[in-house]
Amino acid sequence: MGHVLGGTLLAANRLARPPAVVLGKPRVCCWRASPWPVIVSSALQFSSSSARHTNYTSARYEARGRSTTQRKVDDRPWHRESSGSLPKSTSPDPTGGDATKGRLLTTPTRLLKLILPIPFHPEQEYINSDETKTNKPKEDAVEPLALLVHPQQPLSYLERLIQAEIPPLLVKDREKLPEIIFRAEADYTGGNKSNDGRREESNGNGSNVASYSGLGREGPSKGDTHWVRWSGSTEIGDFIRDAARGREFSVTIEGHAEELRVAVPSFKDRTYYMRMRLRRMSQEIDQMATVKRECDLLAHKGAHALAKGGFAALAAWWGIVYYVTFHTDMGWDLVEPITYLAGLASIMGGYLWFLFISRDLSYKAAMNVTVSRRQNALYQERGFDPAKWDQLVHDANGLRREIKFAATEYGVEWDEMKDLGGEEVKEVLEEEKGGKARKREQEDEDGDGDDDHDHDHDHVSHGAELQGQDILHANEAAANVPGD
Protein backbone atom coordinates (compact mmCIF):
# COMPACT_ATOMS: atom_id res chain seq x y z
CA MET A 1 0.00 0.00 0.00
CA GLY A 2 2.89 2.33 0.84
CA HIS A 3 4.49 1.77 -2.54
CA VAL A 4 1.26 2.65 -4.34
CA LEU A 5 0.81 5.87 -2.37
CA GLY A 6 4.45 6.85 -3.03
CA GLY A 7 4.03 6.34 -6.77
CA THR A 8 0.79 8.34 -6.81
CA LEU A 9 2.36 11.32 -5.03
CA LEU A 10 5.37 11.29 -7.39
CA ALA A 11 3.11 11.30 -10.47
CA ALA A 12 1.03 14.13 -9.07
CA ASN A 13 4.14 16.17 -8.38
CA ARG A 14 5.34 15.74 -11.97
CA LEU A 15 1.94 16.76 -13.39
CA ALA A 16 1.85 19.83 -11.20
CA ARG A 17 5.21 21.09 -12.53
CA PRO A 18 4.62 24.17 -14.78
CA PRO A 19 6.08 24.43 -18.26
CA ALA A 20 9.40 26.17 -18.70
CA VAL A 21 9.35 29.85 -19.64
CA VAL A 22 12.14 30.92 -21.97
CA LEU A 23 13.36 34.50 -21.44
CA GLY A 24 16.03 35.22 -23.96
CA LYS A 25 18.95 32.78 -23.76
CA PRO A 26 18.56 31.34 -20.24
CA ARG A 27 15.71 28.99 -19.45
CA VAL A 28 13.70 29.66 -16.25
CA CYS A 29 11.73 26.91 -14.55
CA CYS A 30 9.30 27.66 -11.70
CA TRP A 31 8.94 25.06 -8.96
CA ARG A 32 6.14 24.87 -6.44
CA ALA A 33 8.47 23.68 -3.71
CA SER A 34 10.95 26.55 -4.20
CA PRO A 35 10.02 30.25 -4.21
CA TRP A 36 13.04 31.23 -6.40
CA PRO A 37 13.48 30.44 -10.07
CA VAL A 38 16.32 28.12 -11.13
CA ILE A 39 18.44 29.35 -14.04
CA VAL A 40 19.93 26.61 -16.21
CA SER A 41 22.80 27.45 -18.57
CA SER A 42 22.11 27.21 -22.27
CA ALA A 43 25.22 25.09 -22.67
CA LEU A 44 23.32 22.16 -21.21
CA GLN A 45 20.79 22.23 -24.05
CA PHE A 46 23.06 20.18 -26.33
CA SER A 47 22.01 16.66 -26.88
CA SER A 48 24.20 13.72 -26.02
CA SER A 49 24.79 12.89 -29.67
CA SER A 50 26.03 16.37 -30.53
CA ALA A 51 28.27 16.35 -27.45
CA ARG A 52 29.79 13.04 -28.47
CA HIS A 53 30.43 14.36 -31.98
CA THR A 54 32.10 17.50 -30.63
CA ASN A 55 34.26 15.52 -28.23
CA TYR A 56 35.34 13.14 -31.00
CA THR A 57 36.25 16.03 -33.32
CA SER A 58 38.24 17.90 -30.67
CA ALA A 59 40.01 14.70 -29.61
CA ARG A 60 40.95 14.00 -33.23
CA TYR A 61 42.44 17.46 -33.72
CA GLU A 62 44.17 17.26 -30.34
CA ALA A 63 45.68 13.87 -31.21
CA ARG A 64 46.87 15.23 -34.55
CA GLY A 65 48.55 18.20 -32.89
CA ARG A 66 50.03 16.05 -30.15
CA SER A 67 51.50 13.59 -32.63
CA THR A 68 53.26 16.40 -34.52
CA THR A 69 54.64 17.88 -31.33
CA GLN A 70 55.68 14.52 -30.02
CA ARG A 71 57.42 13.73 -33.29
CA LYS A 72 59.41 16.94 -33.05
CA VAL A 73 60.31 16.25 -29.43
CA ASP A 74 61.37 12.67 -30.10
CA ASP A 75 63.14 13.12 -33.42
CA ARG A 76 64.52 16.64 -33.08
CA PRO A 77 65.65 17.82 -29.65
CA TRP A 78 65.85 21.44 -30.79
CA HIS A 79 62.02 21.50 -31.05
CA ARG A 80 61.47 20.92 -27.35
CA GLU A 81 58.99 23.19 -25.65
CA SER A 82 60.40 26.53 -24.46
CA SER A 83 63.82 25.69 -25.82
CA GLY A 84 64.42 29.33 -26.62
CA SER A 85 63.16 30.73 -23.31
CA LEU A 86 65.24 28.84 -20.78
CA PRO A 87 66.06 30.58 -17.49
CA LYS A 88 69.30 32.48 -17.38
CA SER A 89 72.19 30.54 -15.90
CA THR A 90 73.80 31.80 -12.72
CA SER A 91 77.12 30.09 -13.45
CA PRO A 92 79.88 31.90 -15.38
CA ASP A 93 79.70 31.74 -19.15
CA PRO A 94 82.05 28.96 -20.29
CA THR A 95 82.48 30.58 -23.71
CA GLY A 96 83.97 33.72 -22.20
CA GLY A 97 81.21 35.91 -23.60
CA ASP A 98 81.89 34.92 -27.22
CA ALA A 99 78.74 33.09 -28.31
CA THR A 100 80.27 32.11 -31.65
CA LYS A 101 83.23 30.19 -30.23
CA GLY A 102 83.20 26.86 -28.42
CA ARG A 103 85.33 25.57 -25.59
CA LEU A 104 86.93 22.21 -24.88
CA LEU A 105 87.24 21.92 -21.11
CA THR A 106 89.03 19.43 -18.89
CA THR A 107 87.03 17.64 -16.20
CA PRO A 108 88.22 16.02 -12.94
CA THR A 109 87.79 12.67 -14.68
CA ARG A 110 89.40 11.59 -17.94
CA LEU A 111 86.44 12.90 -19.91
CA LEU A 112 86.52 16.11 -21.94
CA LYS A 113 83.63 18.58 -21.95
CA LEU A 114 82.96 20.11 -25.36
CA ILE A 115 80.78 23.23 -25.25
CA LEU A 116 79.62 23.94 -28.79
CA PRO A 117 77.37 26.86 -29.80
CA ILE A 118 74.40 25.75 -31.90
CA PRO A 119 73.94 28.24 -34.78
CA PHE A 120 70.31 27.31 -35.43
CA HIS A 121 66.98 28.67 -34.30
CA PRO A 122 64.83 26.48 -32.03
CA GLU A 123 61.98 26.48 -34.55
CA GLN A 124 64.21 25.77 -37.53
CA GLU A 125 63.19 22.44 -39.03
CA TYR A 126 66.03 22.02 -41.53
CA ILE A 127 69.52 23.44 -41.83
CA ASN A 128 68.91 24.80 -45.33
CA SER A 129 65.42 26.16 -44.56
CA ASP A 130 64.38 29.80 -44.78
CA GLU A 131 67.26 31.91 -43.51
CA THR A 132 64.91 34.58 -42.16
CA LYS A 133 64.22 32.36 -39.16
CA THR A 134 67.86 32.35 -38.22
CA ASN A 135 67.94 36.14 -37.94
CA LYS A 136 65.99 36.12 -34.69
CA PRO A 137 67.04 38.03 -31.57
CA LYS A 138 69.80 36.56 -29.46
CA GLU A 139 67.37 35.58 -26.66
CA ASP A 140 65.67 33.07 -28.97
CA ALA A 141 68.89 31.25 -29.85
CA VAL A 142 69.57 27.77 -28.55
CA GLU A 143 71.94 27.63 -25.61
CA PRO A 144 75.40 26.10 -26.19
CA LEU A 145 75.49 22.32 -26.37
CA ALA A 146 77.61 20.40 -23.84
CA LEU A 147 79.00 16.98 -24.76
CA LEU A 148 81.16 14.65 -22.67
CA VAL A 149 83.64 12.62 -24.69
CA HIS A 150 86.56 10.36 -23.85
CA PRO A 151 89.97 11.09 -25.39
CA GLN A 152 90.17 7.55 -26.74
CA GLN A 153 86.87 7.79 -28.63
CA PRO A 154 87.07 8.51 -32.37
CA LEU A 155 85.95 11.71 -34.04
CA SER A 156 83.16 9.77 -35.74
CA TYR A 157 81.56 9.24 -32.32
CA LEU A 158 81.62 12.99 -31.69
CA GLU A 159 80.16 13.50 -35.15
CA ARG A 160 77.18 11.26 -34.28
CA LEU A 161 76.59 13.18 -31.05
CA ILE A 162 76.50 16.51 -32.88
CA GLN A 163 74.24 15.14 -35.63
CA ALA A 164 71.71 14.05 -33.02
CA GLU A 165 71.40 17.62 -31.70
CA ILE A 166 71.09 19.65 -34.92
CA PRO A 167 68.37 19.84 -37.59
CA PRO A 168 68.67 17.53 -40.59
CA LEU A 169 69.54 18.61 -44.10
CA LEU A 170 66.79 18.69 -46.73
CA VAL A 171 68.06 17.28 -50.03
CA LYS A 172 65.54 16.61 -52.82
CA ASP A 173 62.59 16.55 -50.40
CA ARG A 174 64.34 13.99 -48.22
CA GLU A 175 65.98 14.40 -44.84
CA LYS A 176 69.71 13.73 -44.61
CA LEU A 177 72.10 13.86 -41.71
CA PRO A 178 74.62 16.66 -42.31
CA GLU A 179 78.27 15.74 -42.54
CA ILE A 180 80.52 17.04 -39.77
CA ILE A 181 84.10 17.92 -40.72
CA PHE A 182 86.88 18.53 -38.18
CA ARG A 183 89.83 20.65 -39.26
CA ALA A 184 92.98 21.62 -37.40
CA GLU A 185 95.93 23.83 -38.15
CA ALA A 186 98.43 22.19 -40.47
CA ASP A 187 102.12 22.01 -39.59
CA TYR A 188 103.09 22.91 -43.12
CA THR A 189 102.50 26.05 -45.15
CA GLY A 190 103.56 24.79 -48.53
CA GLY A 191 106.47 27.19 -48.44
CA ASN A 192 106.35 30.97 -48.26
CA LYS A 193 107.48 32.96 -51.22
CA SER A 194 110.18 35.48 -50.57
CA ASN A 195 110.69 38.73 -52.40
CA ASP A 196 112.87 37.09 -55.07
CA GLY A 197 110.28 34.40 -55.79
CA ARG A 198 111.99 31.55 -53.97
CA ARG A 199 110.14 29.42 -51.45
CA GLU A 200 111.23 29.34 -47.86
CA GLU A 201 110.44 26.63 -45.36
CA SER A 202 108.51 27.87 -42.34
CA ASN A 203 109.38 24.83 -40.29
CA GLY A 204 112.94 24.97 -39.07
CA ASN A 205 113.02 21.23 -38.44
CA GLY A 206 112.43 20.37 -42.07
CA SER A 207 109.40 19.79 -44.24
CA ASN A 208 109.15 16.11 -43.23
CA VAL A 209 109.14 16.70 -39.46
CA ALA A 210 105.89 17.54 -37.68
CA SER A 211 106.04 20.40 -35.20
CA TYR A 212 104.18 20.30 -31.90
CA SER A 213 103.34 22.88 -29.31
CA GLY A 214 101.48 22.58 -26.03
CA LEU A 215 100.42 26.22 -25.89
CA GLY A 216 97.03 25.72 -27.53
CA ARG A 217 94.74 28.68 -26.91
CA GLU A 218 97.61 30.35 -25.01
CA GLY A 219 99.76 30.48 -28.13
CA PRO A 220 100.24 33.52 -30.34
CA SER A 221 97.68 34.31 -33.00
CA LYS A 222 98.72 33.70 -36.59
CA GLY A 223 97.56 35.76 -39.47
CA ASP A 224 97.94 33.20 -42.25
CA THR A 225 97.02 29.66 -41.21
CA HIS A 226 96.52 26.50 -43.23
CA TRP A 227 93.96 23.90 -42.25
CA VAL A 228 93.88 20.16 -42.76
CA ARG A 229 90.92 17.82 -42.54
CA TRP A 230 91.13 14.94 -40.09
CA SER A 231 89.68 11.46 -40.54
CA GLY A 232 86.75 10.36 -38.41
CA SER A 233 88.70 7.32 -37.20
CA THR A 234 91.23 9.52 -35.37
CA GLU A 235 91.02 9.45 -31.60
CA ILE A 236 89.84 12.68 -30.01
CA GLY A 237 92.90 12.86 -27.75
CA ASP A 238 95.31 12.53 -30.67
CA PHE A 239 93.38 15.15 -32.63
CA ILE A 240 93.51 17.62 -29.73
CA ARG A 241 97.22 17.08 -29.14
CA ASP A 242 97.97 17.73 -32.79
CA ALA A 243 95.63 20.73 -32.90
CA ALA A 244 97.39 22.24 -29.86
CA ARG A 245 99.99 23.79 -32.19
CA GLY A 246 97.29 26.36 -32.97
CA ARG A 247 94.86 28.33 -30.87
CA GLU A 248 91.69 26.63 -32.14
CA PHE A 249 90.23 23.98 -34.41
CA SER A 250 87.15 24.24 -36.60
CA VAL A 251 83.93 22.21 -36.87
CA THR A 252 82.16 22.51 -40.21
CA ILE A 253 78.51 21.48 -40.55
CA GLU A 254 77.28 20.59 -44.02
CA GLY A 255 74.70 23.09 -45.23
CA HIS A 256 75.85 25.82 -42.84
CA ALA A 257 78.02 28.52 -44.34
CA GLU A 258 79.95 29.54 -41.22
CA GLU A 259 82.29 27.15 -39.44
CA LEU A 260 82.40 26.79 -35.67
CA ARG A 261 85.69 27.57 -33.96
CA VAL A 262 86.63 25.75 -30.74
CA ALA A 263 89.50 26.86 -28.51
CA VAL A 264 92.13 24.15 -28.12
CA PRO A 265 93.14 23.26 -24.53
CA SER A 266 96.82 23.70 -23.77
CA PHE A 267 99.03 21.36 -21.77
CA LYS A 268 98.21 23.31 -18.62
CA ASP A 269 94.49 22.97 -19.34
CA ARG A 270 94.67 19.24 -20.03
CA THR A 271 96.66 18.52 -16.87
CA TYR A 272 95.06 21.12 -14.59
CA TYR A 273 93.06 18.73 -12.40
CA MET A 274 95.87 16.18 -12.32
CA ARG A 275 98.34 18.82 -11.19
CA MET A 276 95.90 20.12 -8.56
CA ARG A 277 95.42 16.60 -7.21
CA LEU A 278 99.17 16.08 -7.21
CA ARG A 279 99.66 19.28 -5.22
CA ARG A 280 97.12 18.21 -2.60
CA MET A 281 98.69 14.76 -2.39
CA SER A 282 102.16 16.29 -2.12
CA GLN A 283 101.11 18.40 0.85
CA GLU A 284 99.62 15.37 2.59
CA ILE A 285 102.65 13.24 1.75
CA ASP A 286 104.94 15.93 3.15
CA GLN A 287 103.05 15.95 6.45
CA MET A 288 102.94 12.15 6.70
CA ALA A 289 106.59 11.85 5.64
CA THR A 290 107.64 13.93 8.65
CA VAL A 291 105.85 11.57 11.04
CA LYS A 292 107.13 8.50 9.20
CA ARG A 293 110.70 9.78 9.23
CA GLU A 294 110.57 10.32 13.00
CA CYS A 295 109.08 6.87 13.62
CA ASP A 296 111.64 5.17 11.36
CA LEU A 297 114.50 7.01 13.04
CA LEU A 298 113.32 5.98 16.51
CA ALA A 299 112.79 2.39 15.35
CA HIS A 300 116.30 2.15 13.88
CA LYS A 301 117.76 3.70 17.01
CA GLY A 302 115.96 1.11 19.10
CA ALA A 303 117.23 -1.70 16.88
CA HIS A 304 120.80 -0.43 17.11
CA ALA A 305 120.44 -0.06 20.86
CA LEU A 306 119.26 -3.67 21.02
CA ALA A 307 122.26 -4.78 18.96
CA LYS A 308 124.59 -2.83 21.22
CA GLY A 309 122.93 -4.41 24.22
CA GLY A 310 123.59 -7.85 22.77
CA PHE A 311 127.25 -7.01 22.28
CA ALA A 312 127.43 -5.71 25.86
CA ALA A 313 125.90 -8.96 27.12
CA LEU A 314 128.47 -11.03 25.21
CA ALA A 315 131.29 -8.84 26.54
CA ALA A 316 129.97 -9.25 30.08
CA TRP A 317 129.75 -13.02 29.60
CA TRP A 318 133.35 -13.08 28.38
CA GLY A 319 134.45 -11.05 31.40
CA ILE A 320 132.64 -13.35 33.81
CA VAL A 321 134.20 -16.45 32.26
CA TYR A 322 137.65 -14.85 32.37
CA TYR A 323 137.30 -13.80 35.99
CA VAL A 324 135.93 -17.14 37.16
CA THR A 325 138.56 -19.09 35.26
CA PHE A 326 141.68 -17.19 36.24
CA HIS A 327 140.81 -15.35 39.45
CA THR A 328 138.83 -17.90 41.45
CA ASP A 329 139.40 -21.39 42.85
CA MET A 330 136.83 -23.02 40.52
CA GLY A 331 139.21 -23.04 37.54
CA TRP A 332 138.78 -24.18 33.98
CA ASP A 333 137.61 -27.67 34.91
CA LEU A 334 134.32 -26.25 36.18
CA VAL A 335 133.93 -23.39 33.71
CA GLU A 336 134.59 -25.42 30.55
CA PRO A 337 131.40 -27.53 30.57
CA ILE A 338 129.37 -24.48 31.56
CA THR A 339 130.65 -22.52 28.56
CA TYR A 340 129.97 -25.45 26.21
CA LEU A 341 126.42 -25.82 27.47
CA ALA A 342 125.79 -22.06 27.38
CA GLY A 343 127.13 -21.75 23.82
CA LEU A 344 125.10 -24.72 22.62
CA ALA A 345 121.98 -23.33 24.28
CA SER A 346 122.53 -19.97 22.56
CA ILE A 347 122.89 -21.67 19.17
CA MET A 348 119.75 -23.72 19.72
CA GLY A 349 117.80 -20.67 20.86
CA GLY A 350 118.89 -18.66 17.84
CA TYR A 351 118.02 -21.51 15.50
CA LEU A 352 114.55 -21.84 17.01
CA TRP A 353 114.02 -18.08 16.78
CA PHE A 354 114.95 -17.91 13.09
CA LEU A 355 112.84 -21.00 12.50
CA PHE A 356 109.91 -19.24 14.15
CA ILE A 357 110.22 -16.07 12.05
CA SER A 358 110.81 -18.12 8.86
CA ARG A 359 113.59 -15.85 7.63
CA ASP A 360 117.16 -16.27 6.51
CA LEU A 361 119.81 -16.68 9.17
CA SER A 362 121.29 -13.23 8.75
CA TYR A 363 121.82 -10.04 10.67
CA LYS A 364 119.68 -8.15 8.17
CA ALA A 365 116.69 -10.42 8.76
CA ALA A 366 116.98 -10.01 12.52
CA MET A 367 117.24 -6.23 12.18
CA ASN A 368 114.25 -6.09 9.85
CA VAL A 369 112.10 -7.99 12.35
CA THR A 370 113.06 -5.81 15.27
CA VAL A 371 112.75 -2.59 13.25
CA SER A 372 109.38 -3.52 11.72
CA ARG A 373 107.87 -4.35 15.11
CA ARG A 374 109.12 -1.12 16.59
CA GLN A 375 107.89 0.80 13.55
CA ASN A 376 104.39 -0.65 13.79
CA ALA A 377 104.22 0.25 17.46
CA LEU A 378 105.35 3.82 16.78
CA TYR A 379 102.99 4.17 13.80
CA GLN A 380 100.04 3.17 15.93
CA GLU A 381 101.14 5.50 18.69
CA ARG A 382 101.60 8.52 16.39
CA GLY A 383 98.45 7.86 14.32
CA PHE A 384 100.29 7.03 11.10
CA ASP A 385 98.38 4.78 8.65
CA PRO A 386 100.80 2.71 6.52
CA ALA A 387 98.01 1.61 4.13
CA LYS A 388 97.03 5.23 3.46
CA TRP A 389 100.69 6.12 2.97
CA ASP A 390 101.20 3.39 0.39
CA GLN A 391 98.04 4.41 -1.47
CA LEU A 392 99.03 8.09 -1.51
CA VAL A 393 102.52 7.34 -2.79
CA HIS A 394 101.13 4.98 -5.45
CA ASP A 395 98.56 7.54 -6.65
CA ALA A 396 101.10 10.37 -6.66
CA ASN A 397 103.56 8.36 -8.73
CA GLY A 398 100.73 7.42 -11.09
CA LEU A 399 99.80 11.10 -11.55
CA ARG A 400 103.44 11.99 -12.15
CA ARG A 401 103.65 9.32 -14.81
CA GLU A 402 100.49 10.55 -16.57
CA ILE A 403 101.59 14.19 -16.50
CA LYS A 404 105.02 13.29 -17.85
CA PHE A 405 103.38 11.28 -20.61
CA ALA A 406 101.14 14.24 -21.52
CA ALA A 407 104.14 16.58 -21.49
CA THR A 408 105.98 14.22 -23.83
CA GLU A 409 103.02 14.13 -26.22
CA TYR A 410 102.60 17.91 -26.15
CA GLY A 411 106.34 18.44 -26.51
CA VAL A 412 106.71 20.71 -23.45
CA GLU A 413 108.82 20.66 -20.30
CA TRP A 414 106.94 20.11 -17.06
CA ASP A 415 108.22 21.89 -13.95
CA GLU A 416 107.77 19.03 -11.52
CA MET A 417 109.17 20.84 -8.49
CA LYS A 418 106.47 23.51 -8.73
CA ASP A 419 103.67 20.97 -8.34
CA LEU A 420 105.42 18.66 -5.88
CA GLY A 421 106.27 21.50 -3.55
CA GLY A 422 109.95 20.70 -3.02
CA GLU A 423 112.81 18.29 -3.46
CA GLU A 424 111.95 16.36 -0.28
CA VAL A 425 108.63 15.09 -1.64
CA LYS A 426 110.30 14.01 -4.87
CA GLU A 427 112.98 12.13 -2.94
CA VAL A 428 110.30 10.39 -0.87
CA LEU A 429 108.38 9.35 -3.98
CA GLU A 430 111.51 8.15 -5.76
CA GLU A 431 112.67 6.26 -2.67
CA GLU A 432 109.33 4.52 -2.21
CA LYS A 433 109.18 3.73 -5.91
CA GLY A 434 112.70 2.26 -5.90
CA GLY A 435 112.08 0.33 -2.67
CA LYS A 436 108.95 -1.30 -4.07
CA ALA A 437 110.79 -2.17 -7.27
CA ARG A 438 113.63 -3.83 -5.32
CA LYS A 439 111.13 -5.69 -3.15
CA ARG A 440 109.29 -6.92 -6.23
CA GLU A 441 112.55 -8.13 -7.80
CA GLN A 442 113.46 -9.95 -4.59
CA GLU A 443 110.08 -11.65 -4.51
CA ASP A 444 110.47 -12.65 -8.15
CA GLU A 445 113.90 -14.12 -7.45
CA ASP A 446 112.54 -16.07 -4.49
CA GLY A 447 109.67 -17.31 -6.62
CA ASP A 448 112.05 -18.38 -9.39
CA GLY A 449 114.16 -20.28 -6.87
CA ASP A 450 111.12 -22.11 -5.55
CA ASP A 451 110.00 -22.90 -9.09
CA ASP A 452 113.45 -24.29 -9.96
CA HIS A 453 113.41 -26.45 -6.85
CA ASP A 454 109.95 -27.74 -7.67
CA HIS A 455 111.02 -28.36 -11.26
CA ASP A 456 114.07 -30.35 -10.11
CA HIS A 457 111.92 -32.32 -7.71
CA ASP A 458 109.40 -33.07 -10.46
CA HIS A 459 112.24 -34.06 -12.79
CA VAL A 460 113.66 -36.49 -10.22
CA SER A 461 110.21 -37.92 -9.53
CA HIS A 462 109.56 -38.34 -13.25
CA GLY A 463 112.94 -40.09 -13.69
CA ALA A 464 112.24 -42.44 -10.82
CA GLU A 465 108.84 -43.21 -12.28
CA LEU A 466 110.37 -44.02 -15.69
CA GLN A 467 113.00 -46.21 -14.04
CA GLY A 468 110.29 -48.09 -12.17
CA GLN A 469 108.35 -48.64 -15.40
CA ASP A 470 111.50 -50.01 -17.10
CA ILE A 471 112.07 -52.46 -14.26
CA LEU A 472 108.44 -53.57 -14.43
CA HIS A 473 108.64 -54.17 -18.19
CA ALA A 474 111.89 -56.13 -17.73
CA ASN A 475 110.30 -58.36 -15.12
CA GLU A 476 107.30 -59.01 -17.37
CA ALA A 477 109.60 -59.91 -20.28
CA ALA A 478 111.58 -62.28 -18.08
CA ALA A 479 108.38 -63.94 -16.90
CA ASN A 480 107.23 -64.52 -20.48
CA VAL A 481 110.49 -66.30 -21.50
CA PRO A 482 109.91 -70.11 -21.56
CA GLY A 483 112.06 -72.14 -19.20
CA ASP A 484 114.68 -74.66 -20.31
UniProtKB/Swiss-Prot annotation:
Keyword terms, alphabetized: Calcium, Calcium channel, Calcium transport, Ion channel, Ion transport, Membrane, Metal-binding, Mitochondrion, Mitochondrion inner membrane, Transit peptide, Transmembrane, Transmembrane helix, Transport
Entry superkingdom: Eukaryota
Catalytic activity line of the entry: Ca(2+)(in) = Ca(2+)(out)
Keyword Transit peptide part of the UniProt annotation: yes
Mitochondrial matrix face residues: 34-304, 356-484
Recorded topology in the membrane: Multi-pass membrane protein
Assigned GO CC terms: mitochondrial inner membrane; uniplex complex
Domain remarks: The selectivity filter, in which calcium ions are arranged in single file, is composed of two acidic rings separated by one helical turn along the central axis of the channel pore.
Protein name: Calcium uniporter protein, mitochondrial
Lineage, uppermost ranks: Eukaryota, Fungi, Dikarya, Ascomycota, Pezizomycotina
Name of the gene this protein is made from: Mcu
